[in-house]
Amino acid sequence: MPITSTTPEPGIVAVTVDYPPVNAIPSKAWFDLADAVTAAGANSDTRAVILRAEGRGFNAGVDIKEMQRTEGFTALIDANRGCFAAFRAVYECAVPVIAAVNGFCVGGGIGLVGNSDVIVASEDATFGLPEVERGALGAATHLSRLVPQHLMRRLFFTAATVDAATLQHFGSVHEVVSRDQLDEAALRVARDIAAKDTRVIRAAKEALNFIDVQRVNASYRMEQGFTFELNLAGVADEHRDAFVKKS
């Protein structure tokens, strides 16, 4: 199954994404991912969740080819709702979520990582939003949780990427390790959290979300509204068609 949940150690659930070749996730799978993360947190035996991926990179965002081969706006609407559901599931998961990022993390991957509680990354990890090159907007909400405001704006306007070391400098990435040590690095954090009283940790997760100065769900939905405007204007289709022709 492309979205799987395993228990590498008692109290720790690893949710794995595996959509080769680049983990560009089709619409339905975003909902599957949301369900997997929510179910993990809802289980009283779970003390921490690790979000990880197999393959070349952590996440390449939505499946643009799926959108372009589907008539009308159905695939676009499903992808937007699916991303919203998955990002929200990570943010509202009842226990802390540790993102283990390997390789590229772009588009929707930023939404997942930005809403995670702790991030560990491989040395080759890169982060960015190519949205403006796809005729879309979105996940600036989450990128702004990873880097300062002006850097976020430059990255968004230019579709540039930053490496894991840069995010570690800003404190958003906890640890940078070799790719073969990534799973163990995520497990170390998960073990530290799992060793605490889960009743307190669950209360802390809820409390930290309540005092968050950024209303991430509403903010992201606002961004999606501009994406729909670009689609209605025909701008987004032009950029997605160009992307599909190049790929």
From Swiss-Prot:
The keyword Lipid metabolism applies. This is (7aS)-7a-methyl-1,5-dioxo-2,3,5,6,7,7a-hexahydro-1H-indene-carboxyl-CoA hydrolase. Keywords: Cholesterol metabolism, Lipid metabolism, Lyase, Steroid metabolism, Sterol metabolism. It catalyses: (7aS)-7a-methyl-1,5-dioxo-2,3,5,6,7,7a-hexahydro-1H-indene-carboxyl-CoA + H2O = (3E)-2-(2-carboxylatoethyl)-3-methyl-6-oxocyclohex-1-ene-1-carboxyl-CoA + H(+). Pfam families: ECH_1. Pathway: Steroid metabolism; cholesterol degradation. The lineage of its organism: Bacteria, Bacillati, Actinomycetota, Actinomycetes, Mycobacteriales. Belongs to the enoyl-CoA hydratase/isomerase family. InterPro entries: ClpP/crotonase-like_dom_sf, Enoyl-CoA_hydra/iso. Its EC number is 4.1.99.-. One of its GO terms (biological process) is cholesterol catabolic process. GO terms for molecular function: lyase activity. It comes from Mycobacterium tuberculosis (strain ATCC 25618 / H37Rv). Involved in the final steps of cholesterol and steroid degradation. Catalyzes the hydrolytic ring D opening of (7aS)-7a-methyl-1,5-dioxo-2,3,5,6,7,7a-hexahydro-1H-indene-carboxyl-CoA (HIEC-CoA) to (3E)-2-(2-carboxylatoethyl)-3-methyl-6-oxocyclohex-1-ene-1-carboxyl-CoA (COCHEA-CoA).
